[in-house]
């Protein structure tokens, strides 16, 4: 409920209802029975307008209590498509240095993508996951292009392929990060 309900509400309000109101206003202003030429001209011009709606439709859970989104953010259907690994957003596709697609490497539980971190960073997560009995797969790719693409050195991916947490810095408290990501802590 915390994540998906607001996204469904946003989809209804910000896209479906908005499209219905836009169509209603258009048909009130341009009636083909009154002025067919004006209707056809505006109809043609209108066809290119949906692109912005397509680009802004990006369901995300950045306001979720189990994601490290920006303070004050909310779960919504409105967002922006980016390659950066952002908490609460779907992981972008990437061909790893091994030649495999990142999605082929994700585990059934959580996955930590390690893109070149100080020694021990990924191991801290592995040890914490084991102690907490949280399924965690480690994927390592030290290719600089991958790090630049995701704009992070560590990316914690949920089972639904959404990013729970990412960092370019210190790993932080791996146990607290995992506990929050599974909804068992603040």
Where are these regions (language model features)?
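Helical substrate-recognition/capping region of FAD-dependent monooxygenase/halogenase enzymes
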Residues: 1-186
